[in-house]
Amino acid sequence: MIKAVIFDVFETLITHYRAPLYFGTQMAADAGVPASEWLPLWRATERDRSTGVKSLEDVLAELLRTSDRFDPALLAHMAQKRTATVKACFDHLHPDILPLLAALRARGLKLGIISNCFSEEAAVLRQSIFAPQFDAMCLSYELGVMKPDPAIYRHCMKMLDVAPDECLFIGDGGSRELEAARKLGMTAVQAVWYLRPGVTPSQPREDFPQAQTPMDILNDLNP
């Protein structure tokens, strides 16, 4: 019997790709550094940014210094811009996300989040409209472990006091999250409502059941 529903965040609860993007390419432009030089340096820091080793500000300072472009005002501008674009994702929620969460809670289900996220994303999530609606928010930046490591799933299950076969995991499929959830014994469903061919990194796949809309999740619960 399903007792808890655990969600990925990006491209599941919210999407980057309907708000202005501020990824490595846009940062390189603001820094005045060729993208061909900036992007390898930026991408090489992803694990450290995801597991709390380094904050956004730490990494920006390092990269600006490496590129001989360090300026405190520029760093502050870039960090603020990155945070603002994360906040802007909440302006483009699928209209059924909040009704889905309300419907799940009305059924007495526990709700959890497992997200690979950076310092600025974790800060926004903690202050977001989602924060009071979830019983467990397991954020990689805070925990020092990221999907698909089973440890972050186990941590969430411990917080929710549920077993794997009592969990429904919902995600777009990035970071091999669906495979990890299934391997642990969870029911895994791919969220495809934000996925767009040629735009989003993840695409619909045939090896997992799909939810075309958030409300489809209700069909994957106990009869």
PLM region spans:
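Asp-based, Mg2+/Mn2+-dependent phosphohydrolase catalytic module
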Residues: 1-5, 33, 76, 98, ...
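N-terminal helical cap/lid subdomain that shapes the substrate entry/recognition surface
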Residues: 2-99, 107, 123
